[in-house]
Design a protein with these regions (language model features):
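Primarily recognizes the serine-hydrolase "nucleophile elbow" in alpha/beta-hydrolase
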Residues: 219-266
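Solvent-exposed alpha-helical segments and adjacent loops
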Residues: 32-105
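A domain-start/cap signature at the N-terminus of enzymes
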Residues: 85-148, 181, 236, 292-293, ...
Length: 335
C-alpha cells in the first residue's frame, strides 16, 4: 500500500463531519455528505475518526477499514464517487420525506386516524412527541382477546403509500391469517432507517401499540421484523423489556458497529427471542446476531437462533415459509 492515496464517504447521520474538514474534497460537501481524500501517511488519523468504512485506493482497489485494521478487496475504480451520487439522491428523498412529516405534524393532532376500511384497514398515526407520522395497516380479529402480531418491514418498503409493507410482509401474514390474530403493519417514512429518525420511529411503534383501540390480549404481543425491521425488533426488545411476549428479528442486529459494551445485555433476557440470519449476508452483517445469541444462551435466556450459511440477504422468505415461528410465538405469554 506504499504511496497510496485514499478516498471515502462520510455521512453526518453516522459521524460528525467537522473533524474531517481538512480532508474534504472541494465542492463535495452537501446535504450532510462529504468526500474526503488523504494520503497513506494520514491513515492513522482517519482510523481514529472512523470505526468502519469503505476506502477507494488510488490503485483502483476497494479497501475495508474496520476496527483499526484495513483489508484489501477487489478492483472497484470510482466506487466511492458512485456511492456519493447514490447517497445524494437518497438524502434528497430523505429531506422530502422529512418536509412531508413536518407539514403533517403542523396540522394533525396526536393519535390514530382511520383512512379507509377493508380486510387490512388503512390508518395514519401521528406522534407529536417523537415528531413523526406514518401510515399503517391493521387487520382486527373477529374475536376478542386474540394475540397481536406487529410486522416490521425492510428498508425497501419505506414510504407513505401504505402498500409496500403489505407486499414486503406477504410471507408472514400468509402464515398468520389462518390464526385469526390481530395484525399490525406500520410503514416507516423514507429515511427512518438511520440516526435520530430511526429512534423516533422505533419509539413511536410502541406508542402506536399502546393506543390501538382494538380489544386484543396485551399479554400476547409478538413482534417480527426483517432486515431494517429486524434491527427495529432488537431495539424495541431492548428499550421495552417485558412488553413483548416474544420477538423474531430476521436478518437484523442490535449492535451493527460491534460496540457491544454500550448495551446492557440483561435487558434482553426478559423477552423470548428467535433470531435468524445467514453468514453470507453482505447487507446486514451477522456479527451482532452471533454475539447476542451466544451471550444470551450463556445467561440461560429463552433464545433460539437459526443460522444458515447460504441464501444471503434473501433468507427471510425461506425462513418464514419453512420454520414454525408463528407457533413458537403463540406458545409464549407474559406473566
Amino acid at each position: 500500500m506504499s504511496n497510496l492515496r485514499f478516498r471515502c464517504l462520510v455521512d453526518s447521520d453516522f459521524c460528525d463531519i467537522a473533524p474531517f474538514e481538512p480532508y474534504i474534497e472541494k465542492g463535495s460537501s452537501d446535504m450532510g455528505l462529504a468526500l474526503i481524500a488523504f494520503d497513506e501517511s494520514e491513515l492513522d488519523t482517519i482510523k481514529s475518526l472512523l470505526n468502519e468504512t469503505q476506502l477507494e485506493g488510488s490503485d483502483g482497489y476497494l479497501y475495508i477499514l474496520s476496527q483499526g485494521s484495513i483489508e484489501k478487496k477487489g478492483k472497484m475504480p470510482n466506487s466511492i464517487t458512485k456511492a456519493y451520487r447514490y447517497y445524494k439522491r437518497y438524502k434528497k428523498k430523505q429531506n422530502r420525506a422529512a418536509a412531508h412529516i413536518e407539514r403533517e405534524l403542523s396540522h394533525s393532532g396526536d393519535g390514530i386516524k382511520k383512512v379507509c376500511g377493508g380486510r387490512f384497514s388503512a390508518y395514519k398515526y401521528t406522534d407529536q412527541e417523537n415528531k413523526i407520522c406514518f401510515p399503517f395497516r391493521f387487520r382486527a380479529s373477529e374475536d376478542k382477546n386474540k394475540p397481536l402480531f406487529v410486522l416490521l418491514h425492510g428498508a425497501g418498503a419505506m414510504g407513505s403509500d401504505n402498500l409496500k409493507q403489505l407486499f414486503d410482509n406477504l410471507p408472514l401474514y400468509k402464515q398468520l391469517i389462518k390464526t385469526d390474530c390481530n395484525i399490525l403493519l406500520p410503514q416507516a417514512p423514507f429515511g427512518s432507517n438511520r440516526g435520530e429518525a430511526m429512534q423516533n420511529y422505533i419509539k413511536s411503534i410502541k406508542r402506536l401499540v399502546d393506543e390501538l383501540p382494538a380489544d386484543f390480549d396485551r399479554k400476547r404481543i409478538y413482534i417480527i421484523g426483517t432486515s431494517f425491521g429486524g434491527c427495529c425488533v432488537w431495539q424495541l426488545v431492548y428499550l421495552f423489556p417485558e412488553y413483548f411476549a416474544a420477538a423474531v428479528p430476521v436478518m437484523g442486529g442490535l449492535c451493527l458497529d460491534r460496540d457491544y459494551e454500550k448495551y446492557d445485555i440483561g435487558r434482553l433476557v426478559k423477552t423470548p427471542i428467535w433470531a435468524a440470519h445467514s453468514s453470507d449476508d453482505t447487507n446486514v452483517k451477522i456479527d451482532s446476531d452471533d454475539y447476542y445469541a451466544a451471550e444470551l444462551k450463556k445467561l440461560g435466556a429463552d433464545i433460539k437462533y437459526t443460522r444458515w450459511d447460504k441464501y444471503g440477504h434473501t433468507m427471510s422468505g425461506k425462513f418464514y415459509r419453512t420454520e414454525k415461528w408463528a407457533e413458537w410465538c403463540l406458545s409464549k405469554k407474559l406473566r
